[in-house]
Amino acid sequence: VKERYGDDIHEGDIFLMNDAYLQGTHLNDFTAVGPLFYRGELVGFGAARAHWADVGSADTGMVMGSSNIFQEGWRLGPTRVVEKFRELPDWFDLLTRNTRLKELTLGDFRAQIAAIRTGERRLGQLLDRIGVDTYKSACANIFDQAQRLDRAAIAALRDGTYYREGWIDNDGISDDPVKVAITVTIDGERLLIDLAGSSPPVKGSINCGAVQTISLLRLAYKTMISPERAITGGSFSTMEVKIPEDCIYNAKEPAACQWYFTTFGLLADLMISCLSEAMPERATAAHYGDSMVVVFASSYGAKRGWLSVEATAGGWGGSVTADGESALINLVNGGFRNLPAEVYETKFPVRVEEFAIR
């Protein structure tokens, strides 16, 4: 946002983007960003990301067989859609005309705006109490503390280089297996991650942008390195990630990205397995592997469209002290909650015949 708009950013503005290559996920994930002002001074930015149910792809909700980004919906770079608290009607018209689920989409977007407004209001209340200078000093100290603690945690581990690889059955279009490879090097206070050896971009829609790949690796890092500590702007300073240009995890236009998360469970497991060489007491074995969600959607021409994206659950690997847990959501979709069968049948024209652990 700052790169595109520079000083042309005002109190009350809201910017919106979903470009899969900029933010790393897929076109359904829209990030709303708003500047946070206090007494006329820009003191930060608030952001809220939400998965929009339908963005005009070839299929309702999430296209199944895409082979390029243009089949997956419309793509938006950082764009101002609210200016000085005034919604720009042309943009809102464009947003609602390009979705089959207008009410749900507009409701999600306005909830994102409300979240940013709430954050700005509460930050203002904090600054009323402590002042801007104290706030900035506290942020710097918190970030510095996180960096020091991360460096100490890595320095306490045994130096070494650890390699793992695994395979996804296919990319959803061809029958060719997809390779996932990772090398983790611990060198003093630094943790280096290299994805060289992973598959090049594939025809199917399981490619992923570099930004979200790094986010996934940070998640795996955090499960092993001081998970009890909060994540701040100083976290992950010891972690360096190298992703080859020609790689499934460094998607470029026109690579399809709809199901970008398909390989993420495996990649996280492989990184944890690498780190287990240096800290076996914290590691768990791999958890179940699948595409993580089941999608049902209304047929074309339905009077009222509907969409269900239900997270799957499965078994997690055991640790040195305990067996693995059963029926947990995948690590990547940890924010999902399973929907009770009664609610599911009420909301959607779907009958649940059995809900059980196999």
Where are these predicted regions, by residue range?
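Glycine/proline-enriched, intrinsically flexible loops and inter-domain linkers
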Residues: V1-R358
